[in-house]
């Protein structure tokens, strides 16, 4: 992926403002509620059978924070996101058998939570465009090892 200076600045500036322990749980909860078929990958999380259970589940929140923390790898490797996620992609493909479309769904949830947090004055159309490109690069990298 090639980044313009404006895109790189928008992504890095936004990333510095993101609280992973707020956005991550928000996005993970939204994913499990809006796309309930994704719940099958989280059977070890205990009760996630209702929206209220998902909202109150500490393991859901913790995993959301972990996922958002994992985006830091892409931030630090913006010029080689595919390389940075090679092993994680392989794990999700070969061991966890995650449908790669779920990465896109989670990216949408992350974007919604970020937009809701920062609003249109900070999450402008230009910032949204750069953020979308960034998450598209991450989802592509995570999907790369699938056969």
UniProtKB/Swiss-Prot annotation:
Gene Ontology CC annotations of this record: blood microparticle; haptoglobin-hemoglobin complex; hemoglobin complex
UniProt KW keywords: Heme, Iron, Metal-binding, Oxygen transport, Transport
Residues that bind heme b: 63, 92
Alphabetical list of SUPFAM superfamilies matching this protein: Globin-like
Record domain Globin: where: 2-147
Tissue: Red blood cells.
Reported function: Involved in oxygen transport from gills to the various peripheral tissues.
Binding partners and assembly: Heterotetramer of two alpha chains and two beta chains.
Family membership: Belongs to the globin family.
Protein name: Hemoglobin subunit beta-3
Species whose genome carries this gene: Muraena helena
Gene name for this UniProt entry: hbb3
